[in-house]
């Protein structure tokens, strides 16, 4: 199976600190791939490189087998890679539909849209409602403001936005970080729904039980390198943590 998104030999230095030290990466079609590692392992730098927020000093990124060069997140979005950030990046004062189309607003047809710049709110609300139903997110009124939603529902809006516009990959950065058990479960169900729609997901998480619950494969970072790719069925959580900490050797049971 050919990877949807891959990287070879990524290097990123910040002065004397090497954040990425020749990292390889493969995301396969239709999978949830978790990326784990201690602080300083290079998780954030890797994800920033894949999402266009950081330009690596060396190495290559390929999308569907073709080399890509992202200079900013907009380049990655245009290529079909959407990122749902840890800080949610939703606008609390705006309604759900406006949040889903943030930066991609649909204008009314004709003079009303081109001259007066009026938004086609009905179309945006209808499409938002369809996206939310697709992902089985139980919010009915697209006109309610995001600040009235629970943490899990807000995360749902952010995930729906990513899934609505991604053509190739959805990257989720700590999507359950600030949520309780019930809301975390809801977001994990959402992540599975995104995969069911055929979009592969990259999941960055510190929460190892969550990773083992939802991921098909786990990419383990340590000291700026990829030291393992494992399937949750092949190793237990304790071994994954030991590999992450350098107390156990790396292994690649999940690379086929």
Where are these regions (language model features)?
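Glycine-rich phosphate-binding loops of nucleotide-dependent enzymes
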Residues: 1-256
